[in-house]
Amino acid sequence: MPLRSVILGCGAYLPARVLTNEDLTRIVETSDEWIVERTGIKSRHIAADGENTSDLAEAAARAALAHAGVAAEEVDLIVLATATPDQTFPATATKVQARLGITRGAAFDVQAVCSGFVYALAIADNFIKAGQARTALVIGAETFSRILDWTDRTTCVLFGDGAGAVVLRAEEGEGTADRGILSTHLHSDGRHHDLLYVDGGPSTTQTVGHLRMKGQEVFKHAVVNLAHVVEEALAANGLSPADISWLVPHQANRRIIESTARKLKLDGSRVVLTVDHHGNTSAASIPLALCEAVHDGRVQRGDIVLLEAMGGGFTWGAALVRW
C-alpha cells in the first residue's frame, strides 16, 4: 500500500501583545467601523521587541510535537513557510531545528507569502510519499508587523504576527476513506507580482522595504483563483462541496472567505473563521485557524478538511485532508 502523510497534531503561538482597531485609530486615520466593515478584523497580535519569527516558529513547533505525542528527535524534515525570516540566510527552519535539538534530516524555508503553508505542506507530503522523510514538521510563521508601513491605513490594519505548525507522519493509506493528506494543488502566475509585494530586498534596494498592495485587484483574483483550485481539489478526489466537513481558508479578509464559501454553497457554520482576532498572519493563518478548530473540538477524526490560500506572486493552492 502507498505511503500517505497523516497529520498527528498541531500547535500554535500568538505573541502576547494585542493591537485592537481602537489602538490603530491612534496611529493612522481609521476607525473600528471602517476596518470591520471592509475586512472583518477586530484585533491582531504583534510580536514584542526582540521576538523574532524563529521564536514564534519554535513555540508553535513545540506545541505541535506535544499535541502529536512525537519526540523532536523523531523529526527528519522541517519545512518552514515565511516571508519574514530572521535573516536573509541561514534559513529560519535551521534555527528552529537547532533549538529543538534535531541534528538529522533537512530543514529549509519556503516563500510563497500567504500561500506558504499550503506550499510547505505539499512539499513535506511529497517528501513523505517519496520515502525521503518519515516524520515532518510543517510550520507557518510570520512577523509581518516588521514590514508594514504604519502610515498606510490600507495595509497596516490588515496584518498580524503568529505561528502555527503541524506534525506529519508517514502511514500506509489510499483512497478518500483513509486518514491523511488526500491531495495538494499548487499554482502561481507571476504576471501579477506587482499587485502585492514588498518594495525592498537585498539585491534591489539593500533594505527590508514595506508591503504594498492594490487591494481591489487582489480581491478579484483571489475570488476566482480560490474557487478554481477548490474545484480542482474536489474533482481530483471524486468529492463534492457537500463532502467537506470544514473549510479552513487563509484568513485574509472576511469578504474573500465568505465569497469562496458561497461559491461552494458551504454553510458558514462549516467555515473556520479567525480573521476577526488574528488578522492576516500570512503563512501562519491556516495552521493557526486549523489548530483553533482542532483544539476546541470542531474538527473531529474522520472529517474532510479543505485548506486553501492565495498570496503574493500570485501564488495559490489547496490541500484536502481526511482528519
Curated annotation (Swiss-Prot):
ACP-binding: annotated span: 251-255
Keywords (A to Z) from UniProt: Acyltransferase, Cytoplasm, Fatty acid biosynthesis, Fatty acid metabolism, Lipid biosynthesis, Lipid metabolism, Multifunctional enzyme, Transferase
Pathway: Lipid metabolism; fatty acid biosynthesis
Active site per the UniProt annotation: 114, 250, 280
GO molecular-function terms, A-Z: 3-oxoacyl-[acyl-carrier-protein] synthase activity; beta-ketoacyl-acyl-carrier-protein synthase III activity
Record's catalysed reaction(s): malonyl-[ACP] + acetyl-CoA + H(+) = 3-oxobutanoyl-[ACP] + CO2 + CoA
Pfam hit, one: ACP_syn_III_C
Top-level taxon: Bacteria
GO biological processes: fatty acid biosynthetic process
Subcellular location(s) per record: Cytoplasm
Membership in a protein family: Belongs to the thiolase-like superfamily. FabH family.
Subunit structure: Homodimer.
Protein name stated in the entry: Beta-ketoacyl-[acyl-carrier-protein] synthase III
Organism: Rhodospirillum centenum (strain ATCC 51521 / SW)
